[in-house]
């Protein structure tokens, strides 16, 4: 649906060149809720602006719904933009217009009939739960209600793609949760592909099925949300995951336990998925290795509606200890594991 092929974007300020994007490649599939996460300045917003051609790539290709828009003119983009809706952090509503007129604005600009406008706007306001607010003005609404108006406006043209640029950053946690539920409903009800730009890993965890992690203009990691949460490969991805889920004990706790440890030991970090959470893993391991197994840390969470568990295990070892059977057990049970040294 959206594909970036070795995309770079540079800005020239005075005599300085700023590389906002460097060799970015990934694909957003049809019906995805795809998250792009990174700290401020990572290039996230620049990336999303390439999709609706608010910016043009310096190098590479941007493919939208089968069209290479890299070198499209503004005229050439008109039809493509009809299939793209966008919502922003600060809503971008017209304060002098009613909720109804704000939602209707794209249809008014497209010169649709009054009958069509009324029908379509009424449908969208009902969908976002604001039918009773149609005659009010933005200043009379809460932040969550304003974002619902913005979502209705973005959907009123029946787009194939919805771009969300930090759409929940200005909202409190409870309102954020309700907006994410609404966006998930948008995806499921209308089959709209959603691209979420955010710096909040909780947003990725709660709504997205796939994610790209950005740092300094580059995509440093991509994968399903479950993959990235279960085994983040890069330091920045690990840091983002740790803001939502504690996946391992603190360094101070490990240091204290190591100081108290008598004899040799070997530690494993394991990731247990929902189908395995209720299995007697510790009991199995004790029987396999014939020795004590300690749980130094355990944390459960829900990802994509599935319960998962992170554990840090310690085996007391001696010269006769052989980890072959333990490693084989993890592999047979499809338990992701990592030896900690």
UniProtKB/Swiss-Prot annotation:
Keywords: Amino-acid transport, ATP-binding, Cell membrane, Membrane, Nucleotide-binding, Translocase, Transport. It is found in: Cell membrane. It catalyses: L-methionine(out) + ATP + H2O = L-methionine(in) + ADP + phosphate + H(+); D-methionine(out) + ATP + H2O = D-methionine(in) + ADP + phosphate + H(+). It is a peripheral membrane protein. InterPro entries: AAA+_ATPase, ABC_transporter-like_ATP-bd, ABC_transporter-like_CS, ACT-like_dom_sf, MetN_ABC, MetN_ABC_transporter-like, NIL_domain, P-loop_NTPase. The complex is composed of two ATP-binding proteins (MetN), two transmembrane proteins (MetI) and a solute-binding protein (MetQ). This is Methionine import ATP-binding protein MetN 1. The lineage of its organism: Bacteria, Bacillati, Bacillota, Bacilli, Bacillales. The gene is metN1.
């Amino acid at each position: 649906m959206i594909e970036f092929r070795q995309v770079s974007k540079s800005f020239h300020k005075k005599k300085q060149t700023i590389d906002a994007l460097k060799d970015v490649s990934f694909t957003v599939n049809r019906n995805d809720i795809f998250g792009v996460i990174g700290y401020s300045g990572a290039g996230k917003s620049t990336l999303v602006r390439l999709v609706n051609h608010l910016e043009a790539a310096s190098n590479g290709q941007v493919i939208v719904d089968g069209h290479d828009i890299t070198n499209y003119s503004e005229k050439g983009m008109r039809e493509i933009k009809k299939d793209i809706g966008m919502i922003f952090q600060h809503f971008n509503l017209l304060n002098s217009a009613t909720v109804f007129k704000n939602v209707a604005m794209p249809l008014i600009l497209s010169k649709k009939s009054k009958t069509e406008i009324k029908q379509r706007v009424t449908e969208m306001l009902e969908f976002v739960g604001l039918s009773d607010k149609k005659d009010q003005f933005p200043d009379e609404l809460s932040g969550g209600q304003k974002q619902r108006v913005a979502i209705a406006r973005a959907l009123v043209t029946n787009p194939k793609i919805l771009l969300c640029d930090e759409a929940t950053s200005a909202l409190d946690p409870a309102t954020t949760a309700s907006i994410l539920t609404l966006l998930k409903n948008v995806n499921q009800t209308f089959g709209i592909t959603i691209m979420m730009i955010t710096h909040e890993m909780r947003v990725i965890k709660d709504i997205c099925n796939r994610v790209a992690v950005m740092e300094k203009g580059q995509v440093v990691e991509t994968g399903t949300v479950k993959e990235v949460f279960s085994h983040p490969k890069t330091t920045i991805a690990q840091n983002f995951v740790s803001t939502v889920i504690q996946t391992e004990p603190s360094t101070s706790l490990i240091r204290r336990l190591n100081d108290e440890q008598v004899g040799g030991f070997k530690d494993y970090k394991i990731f247990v998925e929902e189908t395995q959470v209720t299995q007697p893993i510790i009991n199995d391991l004790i029987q396999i290795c014939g020795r004590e197994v300690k749980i130094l840390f355990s944390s459960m969470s829900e990802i994509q509606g599935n319960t998962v568990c992170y554990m840090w295990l310690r085996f007391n070892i001696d010269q006769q200890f052989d980890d072959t059977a333990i490693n084989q057990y993890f592999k047979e049970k499809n338990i992701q594991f990592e030896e900690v040294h």
